[in-house]
C-alpha cells in the first residue's frame, strides 16, 4: 500500500513545482542512499557532483513518471544510476583528451589511465546488471501477453523483405496514439485496423503479432539498455 501511495502522490504533483520541491526535500536521504550505492562511498550535498546529478535525475523522474513505469522508487533509482554512469563516461572521455593534449608526466598519465580503466570496467559491469534487470522486467511484461523469449527466437524476421514489412507495421503503430492506447490499456493489437490502413495481409500481421508487441513495448517502456543491445532500426 505504501508504494502505491507514493506512485499516486508523484502522479498528482508532477506538474506542481512547489510540491515537487517539497517531495525532493523529503526524499533527499533516499537520493543520497541511491548515490552512495552507485559510487561506493559517502556523499554529501553541496560537495559531490554525483549527488547534484542524482538530484536532477530524481526531479526528472517525477516529471516524466506515469504508472506504466511501475514502482516510482525503483524507477527513480534506475534513472539515478544511469545518469551517474553517463557522468562518469563523460569524465572518462575528458580525461583522455587531457592525457593526449596536456603532456602530463608519466606518473600522472598512469594514474589517469587507471581511473579511466576503472570507470570503464565499472560502467560495463553496471550496464550488464541494468540490462539483466530490464530483461527480468520485460519478461514479466511479456508474460501478460503470453509471450516468452523462446517465442521471440522462433518468430524474429530472418529475411530482409520480412524485416521491412515488420518495420513498417511497427512504425505505423508507434505513430498512432489510439493504437498505442489499445496496446497499453486494453492489451490487444488491433489487427483489422492495421490491415485496413497498411493493406498488409491479415495473416502476415497475425504471424508478426508477438514480435511487433515486443518491439513496441521495448521502444515505449523503460528499457534503455535493451534498446541499445537490440539495436533495432525502424526504417
UniProtKB/Swiss-Prot annotation:
Subcellular location: Cytoplasm
Protein name (database record): RNA polymerase sigma factor SigI7
Keywords associated with the record: Cytoplasm, DNA-binding, Sigma factor, Transcription, Transcription regulation
Protein activity control: Negatively regulated by the anti-sigma-I factor RsgI7.
Function: Sigma factors are initiation factors that promote the attachment of RNA polymerase to specific initiation sites and are then released.
Motif Polymerase core binding per record, residues: 49-62
Record Gene3D superfamilies: 1.10.1740.10
Database matches in SUPFAM superfamilies: Sigma2 domain of RNA polymerase sigma factors
GO annotation, biological process: DNA-templated transcription initiation
DNA-binding region, residue range(s): 191-210
Phylogenetic classification of the source organism: Bacteria, Bacillati, Bacillota, Clostridia, Eubacteriales
Induction info: Up-regulated in pretreated yellow poplar (PYP)-grown cells.
Keyword Calcium in record: no
One of the record's GO cellular component terms: cytoplasm
Molecular-function GO terms, alphabetical: DNA binding; sigma factor activity
Family: Belongs to the sigma-70 factor family. SigI subfamily.
NCBIfam families recorded: PRK08311.2-6, sigma70-ECF, spore_sigI
Highest rank taxon of the organism: Bacteria
Quaternary data: Interacts with RsgI7.
Source organism (scientific name): Acetivibrio thermocellus (strain ATCC 27405 / DSM 1237 / JCM 9322 / NBRC 103400 / NCIMB 10682 / NRRL B-4536 / VPI 7372) (Clostridium thermocellum)
